[in-house]
Regions:
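An amphipathic alpha-helical interaction segment
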Residues: 1-16, 37-43
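Terminal helix-turn-helix DNA-binding modules in bacterial transcription factors
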Residues: 15-16, 20, 25, 29, ...
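Aromatic-anchored, glycine/proline-accented short structural segments
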Residues: 27-39
């Protein structure tokens, strides 16, 4: 699963930037400014090389981080959604459910059992 090592340098930089900025409301423009590259090129090539869209990648990483925070802290779901810069808690729930098939609440309750 360590395909990352084979990614072009700019993709690795892009992924690193995303990972370091999960708490921000990241946009394609932020990333293109950071990498000093054309946004359309980034968007097109990221999907071609990584296999999912940049937005999907960012959201998946945010959900992974949310799962970690739910498992390892007592932080409320509202705080988690705020920390990860989701528009609001319902948007957080929607995105979380899209990638896990369950809501953050259901996930949290499953861990308690």
């Amino acid at each position: 699963k360590n395909k990352k090592a084979n990614y072009p340098f700019w993709i690795r930089n892009c992924i690193e930037y995303i990972n370091q900025n999960l708490h921000k409301n990241l946009s394609l423009l932020d990333i293109s400014n950071e990498l000093q590259m054309n946004p359309a090129y980034i968007s097109n090539q990221f999907k071609k090389i990584v296999g999912i869209s940049l937005r999907d990648y960012i959201n998946k990483r945010k959900v992974e981080e949310a799962k970690f925070l739910i498992q390892c802290t007592n932080v409320s779901l509202l705080e988690i959604s705020t920390t990860l810069s989701f528009a609001d808690q319902s948007h957080f729930s929607k995105v979380f459910k899209k990638y896990t098939d369950i809501s953050p609440n259901q996930y949290k309750n499953k861990l308690k059992k």
